[in-house]
């Protein structure tokens, strides 16, 4: 019933829960979900008020109910979730009197932990934590699952899979973006939409973090890419304080006006988040009830994504880097056998630097545990590179293992026209999402004619439809056959390429260098064939981006066909190169600064050792290490460096520091730690992702961080500050209900150690609110904490 209404009529969620619970007596540090059992009538009253205000869907009070947060609670997770669903259902019975159909959604929030490789929580452990909640929610009678306030695309993938694989309920998912349209972990709107649609959520969107006005540009971006119905749940503006109470500055009537604009733009499910009340929802419903909803429109865009950004195929030709593949590469084979990850990662980084848009990943080698190696390499590559990856394997087990842990929507290389192969691959594409390469080969082999290959392409496309896989998620490879053995091979390939684009309207890909096997001076043949293929409709070429011949063909073609506006890219690459001058050779080794910027730990270790032969340890720190960290930090602020890369660079810097410290210890010296800083997540809040990121960065700038952990009472923070004579304290809070604890901590610090400075951060905070609670500094991102610490200790 819900899915029949979704996208065809406007549906209404409820509003905020936390601030209403505070008004009813929820104390700082008290878990809101426990009220499902200890104050059930209060919870039922809140739900009832939302139903009476016009909500079609009410969220259970289970935002933080997962196995990680409730592992040592006095109540079992099943008790909490069951009570949460039952309370909402009782409220529907009491609060809905007009006969309309209403729904109870199992509300699922983040775990509060950062997933590996950035944090310490494994993907499968996150999945298991969500899985329990999902199962209990369905058993208790939930009508749908709403995953919300997610700031990490990897965590939301774990949650969506847990819901899809363990329940039969509809799944909604909403993310929390910043004002730049980015997740905490760096993902942008196209990347998030691409991944969530690949995972087949029933609706997606945005919630929390900002008011309705600030959400308008993000919604506009979502509308460009989303084919499924869209959810929008803003806060009631910005948090303020009045007479010691927190309130939000967008009143119900103003909120309703913005929500009408949001419906006009194309939202299908609307509601409220922090600070919104039944009054906000009632006014929103009254204002928009007669508005017609725009139907969700299918977007025929072929997109793949990493955690950070999406790549669109079908317009400007894309480059798929081919070098992470052992075929014909002795050093690469040895690196796989020796588990030399830095060598392999360096191949990926080099291709990214040379202009690749997607990286092919193939680890097929005898005596290698391919599924395990593929998983490890995929995770490692996604830290050092923000490019989407192409999972290249004929091993179905390895393919599934990689697709499951991949953070984004990958390209998958490949499926072919053999029924057995399609039966194995298409279920994985349906389950995990991906753009799959279809090879035009079937039980009869590779057709000799263009029409034969077009026929196999059609067979693959039709079979995919049976699994609900749209043709936008299929890229056809008509196969480049070597002309040394098949003289008509190039002509047949180019003809098939053109026909596939014209007849089926799908994107295409080729392993370009296959055309020249067995010939002398292969780059000449490859580069000319590459140009011909692009002219005939090639969407993406699997090539070596380090080949000057291939890249010259690529940049020239893009400039000539006006894919490169004003020839800007061509001029950037070749503007300083004189005719007839060969391109500079690639360096064999990276400098320490380069190794840190690229997050290569072994390279950083080696480069530090080499520098120590000619420079003093402290000179290396000041002239190489700190400038490298500054470069990465500035890139993070600008959005050109993503959180995984920031943390990987920090790890590489740690390795370099360790080498330097060892040398100093042998010489009887030491690296003097800088001043001490306390970090803590305040009482009642167990979300410490942001705090942990700040800790890593401060330590890399040699600050001595005292990490008091999470759910820390004000007295503990202040006692430590006094005992240790601390000059700077950093406080973190994610939830509206715990910002009160932050204010209490600051007040106590002002009483007992007034000279101590306080910096605050968290999703529910902003500069105005930081000022109101008495903080000295608001950190909108992790790097800001470093700059402020430097200012406090006079290091700027």
Task: Please annotate each region the language model reported.
Residues 1-475, 481-796:
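Domain-level signal for soluble alpha/beta catalytic cores
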């Amino acid at each position: 019933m819900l899915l029949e209404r979704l996208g065809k009529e406007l549906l209404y969620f409820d509003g905020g829960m936390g601030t209403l619970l505070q008004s009813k007596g929820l104390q700082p540090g008290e878990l809101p979900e426990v009220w499902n059992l200890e104050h059930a009538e209060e919870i039922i009253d809140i739900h009832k008020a939302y139903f009476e205000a016009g909500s079609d869907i009410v969220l259970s009070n289970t935002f933080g109910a997962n196995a990680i947060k409730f592992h040592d609670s006095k109540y079992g997770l099943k008790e909490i979730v069951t009570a949460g669903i039952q309370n909402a259902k009782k409220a529907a019975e009491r609060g809905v009197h007009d006969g309309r159909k209403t729904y109870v959604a199992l509300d699922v929030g983040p775990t509060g932990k950062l997933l590996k490789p950035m944090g310490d929580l494994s993907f499968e452990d996150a999945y298991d934590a969500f899985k329990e909640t999902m199962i209990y929610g369905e058993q208790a009678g939930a009508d749908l699952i709403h995953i919300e306030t997610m700031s990490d695309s990897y965590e939301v993938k774990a949650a969506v899979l847990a819901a899809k694989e363990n329940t039969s309920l509809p799944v909604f998912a909403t993310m929390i973006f910043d004002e730049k349209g980015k997740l905490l972990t760096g993902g942008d709107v196209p990347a998030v939409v691409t991944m969530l649609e690949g995972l087949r959520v029933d609706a997606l969107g945005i919630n929390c973090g900002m008011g309705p006005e600030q959400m308008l540009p993000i919604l506009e971006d979502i509308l460009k890419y989303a084919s499924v119905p869209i959810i929008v749940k803003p806060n009631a503006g910005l948090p303020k304080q009045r007479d010691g109470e927190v309130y939000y500055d967008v009143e119900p009537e103003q909120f309703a006006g913005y929500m009408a604009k949001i419906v006009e733009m194309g939202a299908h499910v609307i509601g409220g988040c922090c600070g919104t009340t039944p009054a906000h929802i009632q006014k929103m419903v009254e204002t928009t009830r007669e508005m017609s909803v725009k139907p969700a429109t299918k977007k025929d865009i072929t997109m793949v994504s990493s955690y950070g950004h999406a790549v669109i195929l079908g317009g400007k030709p894309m480059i798929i880097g081919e070098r992470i593949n052992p075929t014909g590469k002795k050093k690469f084979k040895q690196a796989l056998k020796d588990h030399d990850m830095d060598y392999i990662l360096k191949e990926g980084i080099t291709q990214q630097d040379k202009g690749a848009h997607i990286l092919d990943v193939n680890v097929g080698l005898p005596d290698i545990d391919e599924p395990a190696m593929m998983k490890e390499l995929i995770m490692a590559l996604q830290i050092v590179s923000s490019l989407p990856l192409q999972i290249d394997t004929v091993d179905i087990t390895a393919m599934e293992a990689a697709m499951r842990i991949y953070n984004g929507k990958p390209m998958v290389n490949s499926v072919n026209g053999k029924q057995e192969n399609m039966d194995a691959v298409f279920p994985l594409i349906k389950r995990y999402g991906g753009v799959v390469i279809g090879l035009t080969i079937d039980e009869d082999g590779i057709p000799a004619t263009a029409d034969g290959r077009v026929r196999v392409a059609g067979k693959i496309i039709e079979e995919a439809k049976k699994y609900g896989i749209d043709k936008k998620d299929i890229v056809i490879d008509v196969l480049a056959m070597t002309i040394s053995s098949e003289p008509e091979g190039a002509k047949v390939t180019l003809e098939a390429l053109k026909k596939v684009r014209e007849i089926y309207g799908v994107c295409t890909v080729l392993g370009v260098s296959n055309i020249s096997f067995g010939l002398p001076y292969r780059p000449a043949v490859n580069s000319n064939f590459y140009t011909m293929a692009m002219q005939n409709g090639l969407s993406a070429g699997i090539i070596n981006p380090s080949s000057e011949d291939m890249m010259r063909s690529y940049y020239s073609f893009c400039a000539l066909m006006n894919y490169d506006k004003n020839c800007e890219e061509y001029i950037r690459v070749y503007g300083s190169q004189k005719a007839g001058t060969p391109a500079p050779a690639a360096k064999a080794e990276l400098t320490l600064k380069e190794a840190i910027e690229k997050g290569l730990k072994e390279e950083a270790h080696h480069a530090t050792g080499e520098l120590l032969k000619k420079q003093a340890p402290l000179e290396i720190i000041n002239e190489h290490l700190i400038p490298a960290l500054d470069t990465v930090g500035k890139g993070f602020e600008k959005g050109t460096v993503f959180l995984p890369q920031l943390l990987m660079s920090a790890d590489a810097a740690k390795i370099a520091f360790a080498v330097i410290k060892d040398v100093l210890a042998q010489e009887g010296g030491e690296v003097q730690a800088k001043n001490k800083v306390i970090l803590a997540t305040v009482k009642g809040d167990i979300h410490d992702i942001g705090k942990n990121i700040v800790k890593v960065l401060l330590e890399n700038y040699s600050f001595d961080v005292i990490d008091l952990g999470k759910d820390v009472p004000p007295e503990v923070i202040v006692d430590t500050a006094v005992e240790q004579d601390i000059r700077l304290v950093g406080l973190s809070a994610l939830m509206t209900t715990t910002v009160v604890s932050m204010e209490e901590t600051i007040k106590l610090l002002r009483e007992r150690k007034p000279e101590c400075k306080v910096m605050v951060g968290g999703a529910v905070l902003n500069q105005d609110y930081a000022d109101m609670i008495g903080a000295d500094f608001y950190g909108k991102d992790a790097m800001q904490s470093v700059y402020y610490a430097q200012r406090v200790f006079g290091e700027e």
